């Protein structure tokens, strides 16, 4: 590896191997769907070697990822099967890793959004609830589904949402898009009590819209405006309007 390819990074700055890989990709503006696996593997291993020379405690998951990268790299070094037709589809050895990176990037953006929201939230003074006592709202914001179940279902949504491939560096969480999706969802629930998440996204054209709707669902759950229910694991999400004061 030449000096131009070396990226010296500090271990404490990363939460795990996917975080490190994503940083290497973003910092060099690499297309995540066309990762130069030899180059990235070399940079990844160079950083692990440097951390070891500094006697840093490196989690085992970093070495697991290293073996994964080396396995993918080795697959590119193997001779191609001459008996396979040129136009016959062969799965890209990087496909599974790319999927993990895309999913990690999406959830990273979501986490960053809520962290920013918490930091920007102004100090508020508590007041008596305006909701009628007869219409008690349960304190659990996600209704009959847990946060982990909701996150796992969203992973399934990402896998099923086979649209144009977004550049990871371009996946953004915009306040405006969340407001638009909040309005979109409220309009959906204006004349009926419930709708489904899959029904809402069926005509969406890009991943940003799906992320925006997901965040809008979380916002409305937190504000006790809707409940989220699920009839089976990884199934569709039923979004139900919470009626207060008879409205």
Swiss-Prot record:
Gene3D superfamilies: 6.10.250.2410. Its main location: cytoplasm. It is found in: Cytoplasm. The keyword Cell cycle applies. Pfam families: SMC_ScpA. GO terms for cellular component: cytoplasm. Keywords: Cell cycle, Cell division, Chromosome partition, Cytoplasm. One of its GO terms (biological process) is cell division. Participates in chromosomal partition during cell division. May act via the formation of a condensin-like complex containing Smc and ScpB that pull DNA away from mid-cell into both cell halves. PANTHER family: SEGREGATION AND CONDENSATION PROTEIN A. Belongs to the ScpA family. Component of a cohesin-like complex composed of ScpA, ScpB and the Smc homodimer, in which ScpA and ScpB bind to the head domain of Smc. The presence of the three proteins is required for the association of the complex with DNA. This is Segregation and condensation protein A. The lineage of its organism: Bacteria, Bacillati, Bacillota, Bacilli, Lactobacillales.
